[in-house]
Regions:
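Bacterial N-terminal signal peptides that target proteins for export
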Residues: 2-11
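Bacterial N-terminal signal peptides
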Residues: 10-19
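Sec/Tat signal peptide C-region and signal peptidase I cleavage site
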Residues: 20-25
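A cross-family detector of function-defining hotspots
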Residues: 26-28, 46-87, 108-156, 161-166
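Surface-exposed aromatic
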Residues: 34, 98-102, 133-140
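Second-shell loop/turn segments in exported
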Residues: 35-42, 100-107
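Short, solvent-exposed mixed-charge patches
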Residues: 172-174
Length: 174
């Protein structure tokens, strides 16, 4: 009888562990990657309504509370460290601002600058506004789009991708 109880206990532990792992996996954000033209299925140029079909939890900022007219920057629900910028109701830029989310080539905030330079040959460097000389923007243009790495103390601080004009914004929607 004791052996049977041990087997039941072991089976219950396996079921519990499997259920816990499945629940944790269900809560984990999809492994979407950032490219100059988008983040996972979210593509630069998509209207807000189309993005919202893919991310129903996404809520626009009321117009009277937006930092500037026609521009809205929102955290991406289910993706910690990711923000979306909409200009005139279309997705124009995606920001990565903490470790975790990565580019299609594996770079994330917190990585050494040297790794980004090796991974993205031909990055053009420019001084960051308001910052020290060794803090730079490293940018690669891809047609109408670009990807930009903001550096600080030898590391990637933030990554921006999207339309060339919006990737150049230094202060988000301001």
């Amino acid at each position: 009888m004791q052996v049977r109880e041990q087997w039941r206990f072991a089976a219950a532990c396996v079921v519990l562990a499997t259920a816990t792992a499945a629940a944790a996996q269900a809560k984990a954000p999809p492994a979407w990657r950032l490219a100059p033209d988008g983040f996972g299925p979210l593509k630069v140029g998509m209207p807000f309504a189309q993005v919202r079909k893919l991310v129903p939890e996404l809520k626009a900022t009321p117009v009277d509370l937006q930092a500037s007219s026609g521009c809205d920057q929102l955290p991406l629900p289910g993706h910690p460290g990711v923000a979306l910028m909409f200009v005139d109701n279309a997705l124009r830029r995606i920001d990565l601002f903490r470790p975790g989310p990565r580019t299609t080539r594996g770079i994330q905030p917190g990585d050494p600058v040297e790794r980004a330079l090796r991974t993205y040959p031909g990055l053009a460097g420019a001084p960051r506004a308001y910052e020290e000389d060794d803090e730079r923007f490293l940018t690669a243009r891809s047609g109408a789009n670009a990807i930009r790495f903001e550096t600080e103390k030898g590391r990637i601080q933030n990554i921006y991708a999207g339309r060339w004009a919006q990737v150049q914004y230094v202060e988000g929607c301001l």
